[in-house]
């Protein structure tokens, strides 16, 4: 609010009029938080990857219990499209699974022809 009052007021107007705010408040608030921290985290990741990972640790215990889930979440934090579009998140998640698919190991061309589970994205 102090850095850019116009942007803050605009954001407050968007918050109060969002249908997601009414339907699923926790998800909406999480999305708003991510939109605010993504630029800062991205700059920190480029300037100092070690500090970036260290900064994420207090917010995320997945690094200890499940490194694969942590890396997946880290990729989503760095990609604003994932925050804005859940279909992009689903697509990226499937792309991460493709290397473990037997089709992709035997024949990469076949792996791309496999249907996407959970509905069409395109």
Swiss-Prot record:
Segments passing through the bilayer: none
Any one Pfam family match given in the protein's UniProt record, by short name: Zein
One term of GO molecular function: nutrient reservoir activity
Swiss-Prot/TrEMBL keywords: Repeat, Seed storage protein, Storage protein
Domain of life: Eukaryota
Role summary: Zeins are major seed storage proteins.
Record PANTHER family: ALPHA KAFIRIN
Leftover remarks: The alpha zeins of 19 kDa and 22 kDa account for 70% of the total zein fraction. They are encoded by a large multigene family.
Family the UniProt entry places it in: Belongs to the zein family.
Protein name, as recorded: Zein-alpha B49
Organism: Zea mays
């Amino acid at each position: 609010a102090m850095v850019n009052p116009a942007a803050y007021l605009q954001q407050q107007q968007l918050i109060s009029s969002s249908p997601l705010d009414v339907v699923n408040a926790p998800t909406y608030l999480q999305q708003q938080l991510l939109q605010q921290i993504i630029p800062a985290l991205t700059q920190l990741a480029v300037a100092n990857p070690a500090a970036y990972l260290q900064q994420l640790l207090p917010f995320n215990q997945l690094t200890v219990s499940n490194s694969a889930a942590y890396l997946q979440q880290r990729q989503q934090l760095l990609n604003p499209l994932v925050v804005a579009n859940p279909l992009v998140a689903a697509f990226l998640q499937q792309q991460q699974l493709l290397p473990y698919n037997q089709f992709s190991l035997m024949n990469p061309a076949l792996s791309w022809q496999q249907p996407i589970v959970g509905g069409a994205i395109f």
